[in-house]
């Protein structure tokens, strides 16, 4: 789990993406494009419950940067959701590659909590990954009764 987090910080550094720890009133984490074409990420460490939460937040924000999926406060809900989904999909593919996910299933690791522990992510994030790899989308609310 710690190795995932450290590799994400290294990746950000290699991509010249600033990652700063900042106390924020509302957000837990956020990413922004900078005028010079680079990106910056802010993470509020006081809102992180665990290293897995920090890992998921950083991967998600890197997903925004790597896919260029940004929006402003005036964007309509469907545009926001589209950009959030792109960031989540990037993060899922980075933290839980499909081949490793399939190997975990073949090994008998099928419970969400066990999968989350195996990949060092939060159960909520793992639920999104299962939904993406099973149904091809992130509409977890549509499949929650099935995913259990």
Regions found by a protein language model. Name each.
Residues 1-148:
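Active-site hotspot residues in diverse enzymes, especially metal/ion-binding acidic/histidine motifs
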């Amino acid at each position: 789990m710690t190795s995932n987090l450290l590799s994400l910080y290294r990746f950000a550094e290699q991509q010249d993406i600033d990652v700063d720890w900042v106390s924020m009133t509302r957000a837990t984490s956020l990413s922004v494009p900078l005028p010079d074409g680079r990106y910056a990420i802010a993470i509020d460490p006081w809102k992180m419950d665990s290293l897995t939460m920090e890992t998921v937040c950083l991967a998600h924000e890197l997903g925004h940067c790597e896919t260029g999926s940004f929006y402003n406060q005036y964007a309509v809900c469907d545009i926001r959701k589209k950009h959030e989904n792109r960031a989540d999909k990037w993060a899922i593919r980075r933290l839980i590659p499909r081949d490793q996910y399939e190997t975990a299933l073949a090994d008998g690791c099928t419970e969400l909590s066990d999968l989350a522990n195996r990949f060092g992510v939060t159960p909520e994030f793992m639920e999104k990954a299962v939904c993406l790899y099973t149904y091809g989308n992130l509409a977890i609310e549509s499949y929650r009764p099935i995913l259990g």
